[in-house]
């Protein structure tokens, strides 16, 4: 008699999960592997809060929350936050840090597609930051995010453009020269052109409202938002009301 096959978990790259599981204990180390995320988080948070008209009192979902850097900061703004991730260890770190910080965040281990099947149209704001390039089917994630947001609600995506410049800066520069992130963090083949992302958005109820680039200056060691989406970029969309 054949042994039962383990259940299939759709749209999960277990090698990607393993990368982040291995370094999860250092998620909140401001000088560790996740230092860039800590550095850019005020920019991400400010962009999301400003374009959402503030986060206080809103129900927010952070898709691919990892160790909870963005999720916790949105909760500090007065939002009711759910953090979603498929990595067990990052979620344990996120839960412990929230407990130690006295911040309430509901962390859940499941895919965004599974969550959408149970919680359609329940969130005022959905964020999906630096996650699309780590899953086998990013378009499926976009569809699920569109299902989860309320009509008139906000959905934010951030990812990396796919071109020679982004490979040089995000892979060669960030991983091998500046060593800002661990080697192997990114695979340029999984990067997503803005036109591709907007095409997926257009196939849902979402409508693009704004796009901005995230830029790093190695001379001043600073990040800023501004025109130009040839490397890192963020997209703000809203769910259309029938």
Curated annotation (Swiss-Prot):
Superkingdom of source: Bacteria
Residues the record lists as binding S-adenosyl-L-methionine: 44, 64, 85, 129
Source species: Citrobacter koseri (strain ATCC BAA-895 / CDC 4225-83 / SGSC4696)
Protein's name according to its UniProt entry: Ubiquinone biosynthesis O-methyltransferase
Coiled coil region boundaries: none
SUPFAM superfamilies per record: S-adenosyl-L-methionine-dependent methyltransferases
Pathway field: Cofactor biosynthesis; ubiquinone biosynthesis
EC number assigned by the record: 2.1.1.222, 2.1.1.64
Root EC class: transferase
InterPro entries assigned to the protein according to its UniProt record, in alphabetical order: SAM-dependent_MTases_sf, UbiG_MeTrfase
CDD domains noted in UniProt: AdoMet_MTases (cd02440)
GO BP annotation list: methylation
Keywords assigned by UniProt, alphabetized: Methyltransferase, S-adenosyl-L-methionine, Transferase, Ubiquinone biosynthesis
Recorded GO MF terms: 2-polyprenyl-6-hydroxyphenol methylase activity; 3-demethylubiquinol 3-O-methyltransferase activity; polyprenyldihydroxybenzoate methyltransferase activity
Catalysed transformations (reactions): a 3-demethylubiquinol + S-adenosyl-L-methionine = a ubiquinol + S-adenosyl-L-homocysteine + H(+); a 3-(all-trans-polyprenyl)benzene-1,2-diol + S-adenosyl-L-methionine = a 2-methoxy-6-(all-trans-polyprenyl)phenol + S-adenosyl-L-homocysteine + H(+)
Family in the record: Belongs to the methyltransferase superfamily. UbiG/COQ3 family.
Function: O-methyltransferase that catalyzes the 2 O-methylation steps in the ubiquinone biosynthetic pathway.
